[in-house]
């Protein structure tokens, strides 16, 4: 039986270094890396931060949760 609201929610993760650096001012393709994932509201009540690969920065960076 279902118990109220669903615990799992879909969240968007966005590269924090791309946003901070102003979308790479070099002659590379500009953009912001984003990932879609799920998190359990009961286990992680705060904002989610994961270390993922950013194709625009060409390295692993911290991706933070953003609002939809």
From Swiss-Prot:
Top-level taxonomy: Eukaryota, Viridiplantae, Streptophyta, Embryophyta, Tracheophyta
Subcellular location: Plastid, Chloroplast
Keyword Plastid: yes
GO CC field: chloroplast; ribonucleoprotein complex; ribosome
Transmembrane residue ranges: none
Protein's name according to its UniProt entry: Large ribosomal subunit protein bL33c
Designated gene of the protein: rpl33
GO MF term (any one): structural constituent of ribosome
PROSITE patterns found in the cross-reference section: RIBOSOMAL_L33 (PS00582)
Keywords: Chloroplast, Plastid, Ribonucleoprotein, Ribosomal protein
Chain coiled-coil ranges: none
Family classification: Belongs to the bacterial ribosomal protein bL33 family.
GO biological process per UniProt: translation
Chief localisation class: plastid
Cysteine disulfide links: none
């Amino acid at each position: 039986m279902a118990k109220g609201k669903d615990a799992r929610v879909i969240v968007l993760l966005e590269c924090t270094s791309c946003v901070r650096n102003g979308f790479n001012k070099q002659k590379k393709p500009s953009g912001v890396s984003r990932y879609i994932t799920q998190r359990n509201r009961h286990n992680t009540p705060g904002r989610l931060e994961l270390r993922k690969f950013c194709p625009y920065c060409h390295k692993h960076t911290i991706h933070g949760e953003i609002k939809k």
